[in-house]
């Protein structure tokens, strides 16, 4: 990733003729990563639900919405924003998700220690979404639309699960469910937003 970023900066200082094809390649690469993570996110949510026991997975069950500090799903107005602003919002959300996914993994290690596959999937998801966030920020910088400031402190976000642990096991499972769901929503939204920058992409 760092080598790719360095190459972008080198091409940008050389000339727009050599820079644009390289930027297009970076956008395609990042879009492909987002598309792959969208599929992984669907699998992660299914796997998470399978490991939580009833009532998770039962027909008609809809977990209550619990607040998550520093992160919510894409707003309805997101699609009407300029692409650069959408990508800024994507990058901000992606920067928060690794800490949340790590917190879910730690809680699941306590609740489901015999679910190593789920724990590995959560660990992989945190690492992969961190890579996607860095790639989106690289694209933004190359477009001259860098992300605006840092996201919430990871420690503050992670303590959400500690603070809610006193509310019981069910609440912890619901929080994990929503984190996995938000992970899927944001990587899917990122895929769609990047797709509008890919030549021949669909809006």
Swiss-Prot record:
Transmembrane segments: none annotated. Keywords: Cytokine, Secreted. The keyword Cytoplasm does not apply. It comes from the Eukaryota. SUPFAM superfamilies: 4-helical cytokines. Its main location: secreted. The keyword Secreted applies. It is found in: Secreted. InterPro entries: 4_helix_cytokine-like_core, PRF/CT. PANTHER family: CARDIOTROPHIN-1, PTHR21353. Induces cardiac myocyte hypertrophy in vitro. Binds to and activates the ILST/gp130 receptor. This is Cardiotrophin-1.
């Amino acid at each position: 990733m760092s080598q790719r970023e360095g190459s972008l900066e080198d091409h940008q200082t050389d000339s727009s003729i050599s820079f644009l094809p390289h930027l297009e390649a970076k956008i395609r690469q990042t879009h492909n990563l987002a598309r792959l993570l969208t599929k992984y996110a669907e699998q992660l949510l299914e796997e998470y639900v399978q490991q939580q026991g009833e009532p998770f997975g039962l027909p008609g069950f809809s977990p209550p919405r619990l607040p998550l500090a520093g992160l919510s799903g894409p707003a309805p107005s997101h699609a009407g924003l300029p692409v650069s602003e959408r990508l800024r919002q994507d990058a901000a959300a992606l920067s928060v998700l690794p800490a949340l996914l790590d917190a879910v993994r730690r809680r699941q290690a306590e609740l489901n220690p015999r679910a190593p596959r789920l724990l590995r999937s959560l660990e992989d998801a945190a690492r992969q979404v961190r890579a996607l966030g860095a790639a989106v920020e690289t694209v933004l910088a190359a477009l001259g639309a860098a992300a605006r400031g840092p996201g919430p402190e990871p420690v503050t976000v992670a303590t959400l699960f500690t603070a809610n642990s006193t509310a019981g096991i069910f609440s912890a499972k619901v929080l994990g469910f929503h984190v996995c769901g938000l992970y899927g929503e944001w990587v899917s939204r990122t895929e769609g937003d990047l797709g509008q920058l890919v030549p021949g992409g669909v809006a």
